[in-house]
Amino acid sequence: MHRATLLALALLAPFTTLAHDIPQWHHRRSIPSKRAIIDSSSLSDSYDYIVAGGGSAGLVVASILSEDSNVTVLVLEAGSSGDEVATRRGKHHSMLYKSQLHPGISWTSSTTAQSNLADRVLTWSRGKILGGSVEIDAWASLIGDEDYWNWDNFYNVMKTIETFTPPTSDAESVGDITYDTSSNSDSTETGPTSCQAAGIEARKDPHGGENWGASNLAILPNATVVRINWDTSSSNIKAKSVVWQESASDSEHTITVNKEVILAGGVIGSPHIMLLSGVGPSSVLSAAGINVVLDLPGVGQNLQDHVGNGINWATTEATMMTIENSGSDFSKTAEWLSFISDAIAYVNLTTLMGDNMTNWISTVRNEYTASEAWIPSTDSTILAGYKSTFDVITQTYYPSSIPQIEILLSLNAANTVTIQAALQHPLSRGQITLNSTSAFDQPQIDPGYFSHWADRDILRAAFKLVRKIAAAQPIAQYLGTESSPGTSVSSDDDLNTWMNANVHTDYHPLGSMSMLPKAQGGVVDKYCLVYGTSNVRVVDASIFPMSMSSHTGSPAFAVGYQGATLIRGINNGVISTTNSSSSSNASSSSGSTTSSSSAATTSNNGATSVHLSAWGAIATLFLGCIMV
């Protein structure tokens, strides 16, 4: 076994919770010649569904909606199809993060100067490519009324979006391949077997053959959504068309929507489109000179993100990057390209704070009134929503086993071992507003890092734990001098100064279009419908109202699946939204983010109708979401 492999395996030992082994396919995919991708000359004048954003959630939404053959679906993606960078897929999975710096496939947005981080401006990369941010991610996978959004249902959705085909005997003969079928349905066995019995050959190469697009699905790359045009004749405004451009110098193009517009532009893109369309906080719209079509204070608010950094140690052993940089024959082998070299652990507050935890939590809670001063909006509904999420974090998350810190081992530098720590449930909140009225100018992004002092306290305790891990065997035998920040940085004040100058985003922002009651600053209801509209939904990670103890890739796929399933059910008359407290103009709230809900299922003309009784906290979904 290669020496770097031995080192990586040895380094895993101190971690109590490890990442599931995720197969890393090293084959380069051939580019399919027949897909749903079109150019502007093939556009129709109208579509039933227009999906703004072809990322993790948007493509799932489009795929599911197009399963109804009697509807038409259009995806407008600002980025390219990705064909021009397809050959880069041969790289080791942990090297893909370098593509974040590639302006052709990444939005290199910048934050405002962060006053609590030594006035630094941070880069926020996200995928500018069909497929979204998962196309530039460095990690492969992670793992509440009618309870579409509770843990059990959402976990089932996360399992549904993952598929597995057992290896053939030919593949099994190459190595010892094992797998667990306990979570699979009977169709995984009966389906392929029946197909083979009917004369359909099973392919040995999962990437072989040609992909054919659905005839009722069109995907248009290099199409930036400029705004939504509204019909304001009713109490709930209705999207009547979507305007897009290929570039800032291109003329505007308008496409009529027959049924619904689904925003899937992500945490930055979705609120940006809404603001440019005249929907959002009236103060933000008026300041930008945009006509206020609908005053919805929550648009762009409640922004939150994982923030972290790493401590580095020198090592004389070869690391992943040592091999990558060598250009050796081994660095090009399937063994290397499919090798997983990271380990991960999640740590709760009890482990971080020890006996001081109870008093520390009391201090945080007793200073809530001061916490409101750090929220960028003074709107009463935004403050009410923050109070609700603040209570969940400080009353439920903090004293429980729910992790507050992610610890990640990284070998991404030559002859260097890095142990990273990242905050999982920040109390700090930011916002997305406008820099200009152009869709081609990035909006103003202010994540408000460390605006609440508790976030800095937790992360500082995490770095102290990182040093304890590094001193434990067997990892200690491989580590030399601490190269950054160095052992001289040891006091709380010194660590604070170092963090302010060095922490960075973990690229897991969410919350800017939160699924909360309107009275708590919410933007969408439990059906993903934007309050005050009749046919605009948001289906992406921006609707999650609270950060989770996980990466956001898999949840983004899952929210796309769940959102599209709801949209299909509603438009096909299977799901009823009548008598729901989450209707698009609902504004009342219990004032709590945790409430029970019940489901009643009745028969209505042969169809199943589901009636939702009360809004339940989507936040409860994440109480156990600590999988990677």
Per-region residue spans from a language model:
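Intrinsically disordered, low-complexity Ser/Thr- and acidic-rich regulatory segments
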Residues: 1-6, 599-601
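N-terminal redox-cofactor-binding region of secreted/periplasmic oxidoreductases
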Residues: 3-587, 591, 612-627
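Long alpha-helical scaffolds
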Residues: 257, 606-607
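Juxtamembrane low-complexity tails/linkers enriched in Ser/Thr-Pro and polybasic
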Residues: 593-606
